[in-house]
UniProtKB/Swiss-Prot annotation:
Physiological role: Important for the overall degradation of proteins in lysosomes.
Name of the protein in its database record: Pro-cathepsin H
Signal peptide: 1-22
Enzyme Commission no: 3.4.22.16
Subcellular location: Lysosome
Gene: CTSH
Cysteine pairs bridged by disulfides in the record: 102-327, 138-181, 172-214, 272-322
Keywords: Disulfide bond, Glycoprotein, Hydrolase, Lysosome, Protease, Signal, Thiol protease, Zymogen
GO annotation, cellular component aspect: alveolar lamellar body; cytoplasmic ribonucleoprotein granule; cytosol; extracellular space; lysosome
């Protein structure tokens, strides 16, 4: 029986209490110039009062980024679309409020004994990984992890790449213990698609990034799930086998203070937990490899292609980093 998971789907850049911690910073003219350049890049406009607040938050973030990058780490941070946001705002807009019970995700995956290829990247095998999407300010990462895995599964089985409807999962999957923008689990979403007899395409059920009434039309379903492979909790080697031999794998992990501004490199953290009750963001492992003796996962995120490494990140493999092996699964498509 798995513990209760309290999931979020956006990440958390810990600024301390930003409203007070960042409000008294002495800002240089260079920092102001850099902020204005960032505003242009990200098409940001503020009132005069809000400008001063955003400037303080931005400078606080930027200084933390520079301090991190000056240290000896396996990954770098960088400015991105979240750089003018405080932790409280991120928590309000992105973090899930509904706890998720992983007891429904009991392991049924039987792994072999290997050996497995030293590296794998489904993106390089053909058109088997759909483009990076953007969940916006809705805790719907679980829907993007779900559709990404099923899009890959269908493409691997048929050679046809689909774009599936995350909004259908947001609106319609509540009976499988999912809660729209407040949270959910890919394993439960796969079960919903399986018993619901399909999921529609993005073109017929477009993404809104907010909770709405279910508008599923069975005759317009274009992808179906035959079964769900749920990997035994904390069996990271089974995740390697699944990604190597079968399909990209959906998983959840705990985002902590230094992840939101990730730019490149192999992410690792000493502040996150390895327990299933702390994971808070769902993503998709599309491959794995090793660099300078450090094994890593190649992971597709849902924060748009401008975030991280063109929408992807690397995270250390083999240590259950941030609980990433706690809740892993992938769909077996009905084709």
């Amino acid at each position: 029986m798995w513990a209760v998971l309290s999931l979020l789907c956006a990440g958390a850049w810990l600024l301390g209490p930003p409203a007070c911690g960042a409000s008294n910073l002495a800002v240089s003219s260079f920092e102001k110039l850099h902020f204005k350049s960032w505003m242009v890049q990200h098409q940001k406009k503020y009132s005069l009062e809000e400008y001063h607040h955003r400037l303080q938050v931005f400078v606080s973030n930027w200084r933390k980024i520079n301090a991190h990058n000056a240290g000896n780490h396996t990954f770098k941070l960088g400015l991105n679309q979240f750089s003018d946001m405080s932790f409280d705002e991120i928590r309000h807009k992105y973090l899930w409020s509904e706890p998720q019970n992983c007891s429904a995700t009991k392991g049924n995956y039987l792994r072999g004994t290997g050996p497995y290829p030293p590296s794998m990247d489904w993106r390089k095998k053909g058109n088997f990984v759909s483009p990076v999407k953007n969940q916006g300010s809705c805790g719907s990462c679980w829907t993007f992890s779900t559709t990404g895995a099923l899009e890959s599964a269908v493409a691997i089985a048929t050679g046809k790449m689909l774009s599936l409807a995350e909004q259908q999962l947001v609106d319609c999957a509540q009976n499988f213990n999912n809660h729209g923008c407040q949270g959910g689990l890919p394993s439960q979403a796969f079960e919903y698609i399986r018993y619901n007899k399909g999921i529609m395409g993005e073109d017929t059920y477009p993404y809104k990034g907010q909770d709405d009434h279910c508008k599923f039309q069975p005759d317009k379903a274009i992808a179906f799930v035959k079964d769900v492979a749920n990997i035994t909790m904390n069996d990271e080697e089974a995740m390697v086998e699944a990604v190597a031999l079968y399909n990209p794998v959906s998983f959840a992990f705990e985002v902590t203070n230094d992840f939101l501004m990730y730019r490149k490199g192999i992410y690792s953290s000493t502040s996150c937990h390895k327990t299933p009750d702390k994971v808070n963001h769902a993503v998709l492992a599309v491959g794995y490899g090793e660099e300078n003796g450090i094994p890593y996962w190649i992971v597709k995120n849902s924060w748009g292609p401008q975030w991280g490494m063109n929408g992807y990140f690397l995270i250390e493999r083999g240590k259950n980093m941030c609980g990433l092996a706690a809740c892993a699964s992938y769909p077996i498509p009905l084709v």
